[in-house]
Amino acid sequence: MTKQNIFIDDIYWERVQLYVKGHFEGVKPTRNFLLRNLTETKLFNANHVNIQGSTFEARFNIAILEKGNFLSTGNYILINRQEDEYVCQINPKFLNDKKKQMTLEELRDYNSLETQSLQKSYLLKNYGKSFQRYNNKEIKSYVIVPAISQEINEFIFKVQYKSEINKISKLKHLSFILHKALRKISFNVRDKIYLSIFNISKTVYKNNKNHVLFTSDSRANMSGNFKFIYEEMLKQQLDKKLVIHSIFKPNIANRRSFIDKLKFPYFLGKSKYILVDDYHPMIYKLQFRENQEIVQVWHAVGAFKTVGFSRTGKKGGPFIDSIGHKNYSKAYVSSNNDILYYAEAFGIEEHKVIPTGVPRTDVLFDESYKTRIKQSLETKLPIIKNKKVILFAPTFRGSGHRTAHYPFFKINFARLASYCEEHQATVLFKMHPVSY
């Protein structure tokens, strides 16, 4: 099968006009070139496209591209839309030629970069454009730079507009400094109270052996792996021997109630067993007793993506000296094959990773449960009756809950729809909670 690609061979500027030259490989040449942001909420047509044979030249007037205004801040991919949609790629030969032209100093800077995407972006940095304006009151900066996105590993144009006050009044400056200082004082006071409650509780209950805490910063109730562990504990009547506590919060951005802010460090210090199922930043700075067990029952079923220290050097990943995850005494995973990957992700020794299987997958062996759930889904979604059902439940891209999104442009929906028609199938999308 012939490979289908659209390659970018050159980028150049004439005033506010951005020109992109390239060629088609195995793709029908068409003029329908567009810039689209990663969240697929903005789409802008090229002002002019010239095609000769298999080559193209697209022009974008960035000063008027967005409804008569300049292209707004964001990251944009270049696409060609026809029956299928193609994301334009930078030609590897173009990058190799740029690398050969580097000076020794540039080569040293290039080799010091941690990822291939950063290195490729370094080779592209001179193909951007910067517009600046200064006066006594304001500094304006508008920059467009071609790069390789660390989030989606695709060629993008990074657009950034900044407008800064050149001089601020002494009163405003003083207000800013005061506000910043008060926030720091407030944080330090709350942090000291949190640590004090934890340390007192840890000392008072140093010999405690019968308290268990379920806690999550991304779960509102006893669900997921927690639910199945808890139900098994009840089934074995362990609730008669153990005192079970739970502190939950729907997502990491939510604030705890005043009562939970006091109860949380108290239960952390008191409990012999502390079960978590996701990233939980409030526990990593604590010094637990040696006889306490911090047990990670990670929510994912297998090592399907990189997390934690497996993302060191990538955007949003921790640095090697981060304390995140490292105080787990045990982590339970789905199989022996996962031990290496979860030990790496959590920054813990491999013997602490135990392949028991994932609690919430037990239901896959419960025929009555499967029948009940299937009937429930068919009632809610009649479209799936008598169809092959495909569930797509991807992770997210972005550095956290504020920037979380999914790059839907990587899915060829036309081909997916064609497959569904041919095979009597329905695809269900279940997005990651962080990207809601």
What are these regions (language model features)?
Residues 1-210:
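Basic, ligand-binding patches in group-transfer machinery
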Residues 7-9, 200-202, 264, 283-285, ...:
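Generic recognition of flexible, low-complexity loop/linker segments
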Residues 23, 35, 43, 55, ...:
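Active-site and donor-binding regions of nucleotide-sugar-utilizing enzymes
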Residues 83-86, 234-245, 349-351, 415-426:
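Structural alpha-beta junctions
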Residues 178-190, 214-217, 360-366, 398-403:
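Acidic/glycine-enriched edge-of-secondary-structure segments
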Residues 203-213, 291, 385-388:
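A short, charged/proline- and glycine-enriched loop
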Residues 221-232, 360-436:
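Conserved catalytic-core segment of nucleotide-activated headgroup transferases in glycan assembly
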